[in-house]
Amino acid sequence: MAPDTAFALASRFVELDTMAWTDTPNPGMKVKILYHDPATGLLTMLSKLAPGAGIPEHTHEDLEQTFVLEGSLVDDEGACTAGNFVIRAKGSRHAPVAPNGCTMLVFFMKPTAALSKMLQKGH
């Protein structure tokens, strides 16, 4: 099978230490966009929430997978703590908060409406 033509080489290495954190419209939330395919919506990002920061209630456009690296992410369904993983189905709604801060690796099949707007603005 031929490599994906999205890259000049068969692999694309992303040096996270050379990437700056990008502020988002949500106070206390920063992201590093690791991969985004506008044609399909596929998005991989690191997200960092300051202690007490949250994300306004939103609906997932498609499957989202989150691996919490540090801290915890809490919503009305429970808490996902460091070293753990949560999957959110298409159509699920929540308003997560990070009581003690949180750093997470997030995979979206399609970004939420708010993330889509942010990506369109070039963040």
What does each model-found stretch correspond to?
Residues G54, N84-F85, T103:
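Residue-level marker of beta-strand positions
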Residues V31-I33, T44-K48, Q65, F85-I87, ...:
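Conserved hydrophobic/aromatic beta-strand scaffold that supports enzyme active sites
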Residues K90-L115:
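Ligand-binding loop in jelly-roll beta-barrel domains
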Residues A39-G41, A50-A53, V74, P111-A113:
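Short, charged/polar surface micro-motifs in flexible loops or helix N-caps
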Residues D75-A95:
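Short acidic-glycine-tyrosine-enriched beta hairpin
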Residues M1-T40, K121-H123:
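A short, N-terminal "cap"/entry segment at the start of jelly-roll beta-barrel domains
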Residues P51, T59-D75:
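Glycine- and acidic-residue-biased ligand/ion/polar-headgroup-sensing regions
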